[in-house]
Amino acid sequence: MSRKLCTLNFTLSGKQGSLVIRDIQLWSNRPTASKSTSELRGQFIQYVDLAKLPLWVRSTNMNTYRCYSTSATAQAYFKSKLRNANRGIVIELSDKVDQRSQEPAYLIIFRENTELNCFQVDLTMKHEFDGQVTKLKQEIGKTRASVSKEGSIDIIIQQSQQRKIGTKTKVYRNVHINDKRLQFNETLSKLILGGLRLRGISNSITDYQKLYKITFDAAEFTHRDELKRISMGSGEEVSFESLQETVETLLKLFTKS
């Protein structure tokens, strides 16, 4: 059952001054502990091409929220700016911060078919990259400080470069594995939602979320061997056709009257 989480107002800045886009209601299909709704304030940052965003900005347990508005100004704005299916609007939240970095949190609003959605940017992987870079700089600084006149500078530089290459290789490998798993989850979710729509099952129907979850879990279990190989870095992506066949089989089983 959908529940209203909060209302978002954000400011546009331009040559003609500031314009506030108001009354953007964020709704979630997932159960939440809090029953109260809040108001978020934000600032428009820029437009982005969703196809060019790295997959890690959307975590595996990320919530996608439905957006609604009764404001004619907001409706006209989104209709004008989100004509391109791959376009997103980046909003910096004024009164919400990322729990890990204590930096501002960001939302990306986008259109999927006729629906307006948004998600919060996941900065976890970015912080890991930043941490690796900081660590490398510290190691290089220590190496330079320990060089003596009698020491071999060539050997020290070579060792430093080898450590950098090894660290970069490990980071790239982890990113590649994470991208494959995120792609699997994203494709699986879209196939399930599409299959439910084709069967005339809307999210207003009782047990909609339960049907979605058991189908998702069952599909993951079906492809557990491939996912295990992916997590070890030795597996290929699960093909779209294979995943589509799995979802169709499961939905036929679970929706059989």
Swiss-Prot record:
Q: Which UniProt keywords apply?
A: Cell cycle, Cytoplasm, Cytoskeleton, DNA replication, Nucleus
Q: Where in the cell is it found?
A: Nucleus; Cytoplasm, Cytoskeleton, Spindle pole
Where does it mainly reside?
nucleus
The entry describes its oligomerization and partners as: Interacts with SLD3.
Top-rank lineage group of the source organism: Eukaryota
Say yes or no: keyword Nucleotide-binding present.
Answer: no
Which GO annotations describe the biological process of this protein?
DNA replication; regulation of DNA-templated DNA replication initiation
Please tell me the species this chain comes from: Saccharomyces cerevisiae (strain YJM789)
Specify whether Isomerase is a keyword of the entry. no
Q: What is one cellular component GO term in this UniProt entry?
A: cytoplasm
From the Swiss-Prot or TrEMBL record, give the protein name: Mitochondrial morphogenesis protein SLD7
Recorded family membership: Belongs to the SLD7 family.
Record's InterPro entries?
Sld7, Sld7_C, Sld7_N
